[in-house]
UniProtKB/Swiss-Prot annotation:
The keyword Metal-binding applies. Iron/alpha-ketoglutarate-dependent dioxygenase; part of the gene cluster B that mediates the biosynthesis of austinol and dehydroaustinol, two fungal meroterpenoids. The first step of the pathway is the synthesis of 3,5-dimethylorsellinic acid by the polyketide synthase ausA. 3,5-dimethylorsellinic acid is then prenylated by the polyprenyl transferase ausN. Further epoxidation by the FAD-dependent monooxygenase ausM and cyclization by the probable terpene cyclase ausL lead to the formation of protoaustinoid A. Disulfide bonds: none annotated. The keyword Protein biosynthesis does not apply. GO terms for biological process: terpenoid biosynthetic process. SUPFAM superfamilies: Clavaminate synthase-like. It comes from Emericella nidulans (strain FGSC A4 / ATCC 38163 / CBS 112.46 / NRRL 194 / M139). Belongs to the PhyH family. This is Iron/alpha-ketoglutarate-dependent dioxygenase ausU. Fe cation binds at residues 45, 47. Pathway: Secondary metabolite biosynthesis; terpenoid biosynthesis. Its EC number is 1.14.-.-. In A.calidoustus, the austinoid gene cluster lies on a contiguous DNA region, while clusters from E.nidulans and P.brasilianum are split in their respective genomes. Genetic rearrangements provoked variability among the clusters and E.nidulans produces the least number of austionoid derivatives with the end products austinol and dehydroaustinol, while P.brasilianum can produce until acetoxydehydroaustin, and A.calidoustus produces the highest number of identified derivatives.
Length: 148
């Protein structure tokens, strides 16, 4: 995981670092997600279904997509903090995602504007991993951006 100091965080800096060995990249999407109070929980899921080409890439392929998640407000358990199951892209957790022990494998992210919650190779952690949002009791705003 790449940790970038809070004051110097920049989406393009992160993408440049991840794609330095494979060449150019494009900022392909960006959106702001708002989780409203008492929103229903979103269960663990894998975002790779959104990118079918990833299913045909060998494990040795360079990262094709990097998704960055930045909380615009503090992400807490009460307002729906995202959890990531690291290494879940390897498929070992596929049949146990909802099973016992999942909380011990899940890492919660972050504080408002905290780049350490976003400046990682999300191909391995978030995009091919899983996320979960608990019932929100107040607003949570997240910025998502993808480079490919």
């Amino acid at each position: 995981m790449t940790i970038i100091p809070k004051r110097s965080y920049n989406v393009l800096t992160t993408c440049k670092a991840v794609f330095r060995d494979v060449g150019d990249y494009w900022l392909t999407t960006g959106n702001l997600r708002t989780t409203k109070p008492q929103s229903p929980a979103q269960g663990f899921h894998r975002d790779t279904l959104l990118y079918p080409v990833l299913q045909y890439q060998p494990a040795t392929s360079p990262s094709l997509i990097v998704t960055l998640l930045v909380s615009m407000t503090d992400a807490t358990v009460a307002n729906g903090a995202t959890r990531v199951i690291l290494s879940s892209q390897n498929g070992r957790l596929l049949n146990t995602i909802g099973g016992p022990g999942r909380a011990s494998r899940a890492k919660r992210w972050g504080h408002a504007g905290n780049p350490s919650a976003a400046a990682a190779r999300w191909w391995e952690a978030y995009e091919s991993g899983t996320e979960y949002k608990t019932n929100a009791t107040n607003f949570l705003h997240k910025m998502l951006a993808s480079c490919s």
